[in-house]
Amino acid sequence: MFDDIWRQFRKQRLGLIGGGILCMLLLVALLAPVLAPYDPLAQDLYKRLQPPSIDHWFGTDDFGRDILSRIVYGSRISLRIGLIAISLALTGGTLFGLVAGYRGGMVDMLIMRLMDLMLAFPSILLAIAIVAVIGPGIENAILAVSIVLVPQFARLVRSSVLTVREATYVEAARALGATESRLLFYSILPNCTAPLIVQTTLGMGTAILDAAGLSFLGMGAQPPVPEWGAMLSGGRELLLRAPWVMTFPGLAIFTVVLGLNLFGDGLRDALDPKTT
């Protein structure tokens, strides 16, 4: 099975490019202390707002901090935010979807109407509202982003459960006395694995983008943390004088989100039964 999936995935050139971008992000995050030429928090007011040069490839910001070093260390923060947020969303959405699809009736209606209500708002607006209630900070931003991504997973899992809950093998397991939890997690959930993998990859891009948006608005990571969205926020008043302060963090966000989307699309096509 995995050989078939890998064979199909290798045909997805854009998916391979996306995978390469993700591998590069992972390596940069892991090797940040080695790759970063300077301390990301070190200030040198004598070198403030220097354009890209041999000494500072991406230039310096208004505190004289090396932008390349801050972007390199920022990859760790963005990766952590994306992984934690998508893991929480995956767990919560899967549980809601399993219960809604298996129980049906009033339980299904209540859960799905709640999901529909959340989906009625753009994810970033809902995340802003949540952070406005619980307060700013990276941890609260992660929680807010994970909450707004729950409906995507819940609807996906519910639709898969509705497809297989009356399948012969599920009925056989039920007849043999399998408990409800065993039916859900051992008989039904494995059939949701492929679409969940794809949604997790695509959702992680949304998580990183929304978290960067919160930091840009001052509701996520707080200075002097080298988070890409916070770096964008710090450079918005310098756009005309020192455009590199915003340009390189913006390119970092764009590249990572693009890589996740390309990789997710490649996985989706590789896992499509019509191609495998």
Please tell me what each predicted stretch does.
Residues 60-65, 102-103, 162, 172-182, ...:
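Short helix-to-coil transition segments within interhelical loops
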Residues 11, 69-81, 85, 116-119, ...:
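Alpha-helical transmembrane segments of multi-pass membrane proteins
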Residues 76, 118, 122, 131-135, ...:
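Residue-level hotspots within pore-lining transmembrane alpha-helices
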Residues 57, 91-92, 101-102, 107-163, ...:
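Generic hydrophobic transmembrane alpha-helix motif, especially the helices
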Residues 1-94, 98-99, 105-106, 110, ...:
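Gly/Trp-centered helix-boundary motif
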Residues 130-133, 145, 160-161, 210-252:
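Glycine-rich helix-loop "coupling/hinge" segments at transmembrane-helix boundaries
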